[in-house]
Amino acid sequence: LPSVEIATHSYTHPFYWADVDKGIASTAAQGYTLTPPGYIPSLEREIVGSTDYIRQRLAPAGKPVRLLLWTGNAAPTERALAISERAGLLTMNGGNTIASRTYPSLTAVGPLGIRLGEHFQAYAPIMNENVFTNLWTGPFYGFERVIETFRFTGSPRRIKPIDIYYHTYSATKRASL
């Protein structure tokens, strides 16, 4: 599929990137992180290792991996951004845009990104279902409110692009469908 971009989403799906930078294995209260026995978290393994694995074993020949979608709190450290750049990866995620009828304010619209030292982290245009469902604790129908965000950020002027970002596990709850 020529219009599909292959991305890495890391090796263990860390929730706290600052902990990975320190070699600390931590998980969010809700889980969300793989914990291989004996694994010591490493930015190189999470970023470069996962990218190399996809390039060598999963991607079609000639199809590059050029994107890292940050996991968890999507708050990489400056060093994580530097490693990503050296690996030839663009990066994106975070930002927490959730403007809706509940939060009808431009203050609920995240910026385009944030500068960390010499690096720039591009934020996702609109957040995934986790933000709308309180980190997948409910209400599980919460992601339907993303339509309110699309409307809020699109009129009277488009201030954010539209993207649909969700995890396939959200189909495990009837309310989320």
What are these regions (language model features)?
Residues 37-44, 48, 52-60, 65, ...:
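Catalytic grooves of carbohydrate-active enzymes
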Residues 103-119, 141-153:
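Alpha-helical scaffolding within the catalytic cores
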Residues 79, 92, 112-115:
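Flexible, glycine-rich surface segments
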Residues 1-75, 79, 87, 94-104, ...:
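Metal-dependent polysaccharide deacetylase catalytic core of the NodB/CE4 family, i.e.
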